[in-house]
Amino acid sequence: MRIGILGGTFDPIHYGHIRPAIEVKEALGLDKVLLMPNHIPPHKHQPNLSTAQRLKMVADVCAELAGFELCDIEANRDTPSYTVVTLEQLSTQYPNAELFFIMGMDSFIHLQSWHKWQQIFGFANLVLCQRPGWHLSNEHPMQQVLMERSAAIDTLKNPPQKHYPIHGRIFTVDITPQDISSTQIRSALAIGKIPTDALMPVTLNYIQKQQLYLS
């Protein structure tokens, strides 16, 4: 089994998260994608909404998307949501699965600042989402890591080896640019605008019913 993992504050979850995840799932032929709300994000400010509210929004989205599941593993920890700790737990939970941690290229270029970042490759593959035509400069310190671990998507045409999941590779997927951000959505909602083009109806319905993000 091949499992994608997309973490985020999801404050709120929107099409800028969902559409790239769908594109990655299709490009790599993943069996499912776990959407994982951060509880205590180490690289961001604390979310506006509670963890319970963000879990609810993500659960609602997953209920409407085939092959997507809510992962609450970080929500159940009262420690910072370090990726390496999460992936170690997931590799124990899915011992025969190949894990694919999905991230933007904007996050990858700062990977060296992450907690025990080199150990991440022992538990999962990375999937880098990038805009078509964008490339990491040869001078960037992460370029060497990318070159050493880069793998072609075509290699996934072979079925995964049961009991011997392969980790440590980096796959790059060109995704359709999404000019959407949670900050923009929160700002719009605060002044009474309804960003119907950015949110799934089920998410917008929950936000309106709970009167969230109002100034």
From Swiss-Prot:
Disulfide cysteine pairs (residue numbers): none
Catalysed conversion reaction: nicotinate beta-D-ribonucleotide + ATP + H(+) = deamido-NAD(+) + diphosphate
Keywords of this entry: ATP-binding, NAD, Nucleotide-binding, Nucleotidyltransferase, Pyridine nucleotide biosynthesis, Transferase
Catalytic EC class: transferase
Family, similarity comment: Belongs to the NadD family.
HAMAP family the UniProt entry points to: NaMN_adenylyltr (MF_00244)
Protein name: Probable nicotinate-nucleotide adenylyltransferase
Organism: Shewanella sp. (strain W3-18-1)
